[in-house]
Amino acid sequence: MPLHNLTRFPRLEFIGAPTPLEYLPRFSDYLGREIFIKRDDVTPMAMGGNKLRKLEFLAADALREGADTLITAGAIQSNHVRQTAAVAAKLGLHCVALLENPIGTTAENYLTNGNRLLLDLFNTQIEMCDALTDPNTQLEELATRVEAQGFRPYVIPVGGSNALGALGYVESALEIAQQCEGAVNISSVVVASGSAGTHAGLAVGLEHLMPESELIGVTVSRSVADQLPKVVNLQQAIAKELELTASAEILLWDDYFAPGYGVPNDEGMEAVKLLARLEGILLDPVYTGKAMAGLIDGISQKRFKDEGPILFIHTGGAPALFAYHPHV
C-alpha cells in the first residue's frame, strides 16, 4: 500500500468511524450532474469540521512532547481555533488563541457569537492582535511569553496546516477511496483551499489512490499566484514525510473569494441557501459557501475535465452562520 508510512506517526483517534460520503439527489437534479458530498462537517467534536483530522496528529505530537498548552492563531471566527480549543479541553490542556479581526467589523454578532462564543465555553485564553501579518513569528513570540509564565506550550500553525497536520487529509483520501471503491467513479473533487493543509493532504493521497480524479481547490483568501506555492510546498513536505513522490498538478480556481477572506459574497451565500433548501445541509459564508459557488459555476462554465460525478469535501464551518447574521 503506497501510504503505509502513515502508521508511523502518533495519532489520537478523535473521529472514530469514517464520516459519511453521501449522494445529493435533489442537488444533483438541480445541477444536472451527479454530486456527492464528504461530510467532514459532522466530525464528532465542537460542532464538527475538517480541522479535527489534523488535530489527531498535532495533539498526539503535543502530548508526546509533554506540552500542557496548545497555542494557535486565526480569525475571530476561526473554525480551526474553535476545534483546537475543544481538543485542548478534552485533553485537559490549556489553550491560548491569538486572534485577528480580518474584516475590520464592529458588528457585535461577529465579535461575540458563533465560533467566538464557543471559545469562551471551552475556557480559551484570548490574545488579540491588529493583524496576523507574520503568524509563525507571532505564534513563536506568544509561546515564549507563555513559557515564561511556567507553561509548556506547543504551537499549532494557522489552520493546523503543516506537514504533520496535513497527514489528516492523506488519511481522509484513504477513507474516500475506500468509500468510493465499487460504488462510484469520482471524476472531480472540489475543496476549499485556504491555509492549504487540507488541499495538500488530499493532493498527495488522491494522487496515489484515485489518480484518475482531478482535485480542484477553490481559493478562499488568495489569488492562484499566491496560493499555488503554499499548496505545492506543503504537498512536497507531506510527500517527504511519507517517503512518496508527489507530482500531481495542483489545480486552483480563484474566481470566487472576492471581495476577500471572511467577507461573504452573493454567489457564496446563494450556494449556502441552495444546499440548505435542497438537502438540509449547512455550508458557511467563508469557506464552503464559496467553494460550492465554484462547483456550481464550474459546471455551468464546463470547467471540469468531463461530466462525471463530482465529490464536494464539506469541511464544516456552520457555526459562523450565526456570527454573520443578519447578512445571511
UniProtKB/Swiss-Prot annotation:
Cofactor(s) listed: pyridoxal 5'-phosphate
Q: Which GO terms describe its molecular function?
A: D-cysteine desulfhydrase activity
Q: Which gene encodes it?
A: dcyD
- Provide this UniProt record's keywords sorted from A to Z: Lyase, Pyridoxal phosphate
Which EC number(s) does UniProt give? 4.4.1.15
Subunit-structure text: Homodimer.
Q: Which domain of life is it from?
A: Bacteria
**A Pfam family matched in the record:** PALP
What exactly does this protein do? Answer: Catalyzes the alpha,beta-elimination reaction of D-cysteine and of several D-cysteine derivatives. It could be a defense mechanism against D-cysteine.
Question: What Gene3D superfamilies has UniProt attached to this entry?
Answer: 3.40.50.1100
Q: Lineage of the source organism?
A: Bacteria, Pseudomonadati, Pseudomonadota, Gammaproteobacteria, Enterobacterales
N6-(pyridoxal phosphate)lysine: modified positions: 51
Report what the protein is called.
D-cysteine desulfhydrase
Query: Which NCBIfam families does the UniProt record give?
Result: ACC_deam_rel (TIGR01275), PRK03910.1-1 (NF003029), PRK03910.1-3 (NF003030), PRK03910.1-5 (NF003032)
Q: Which HAMAP family match?
A: D_Cys_desulfhydr
Family, similarity comment: Belongs to the ACC deaminase/D-cysteine desulfhydrase family.
Q: Name one GO biological process term.
A: D-amino acid metabolic process
- Catalytic reaction list: D-cysteine + H2O = hydrogen sulfide + pyruvate + NH4(+) + H(+)
Enzyme class, top EC level, equals lyase
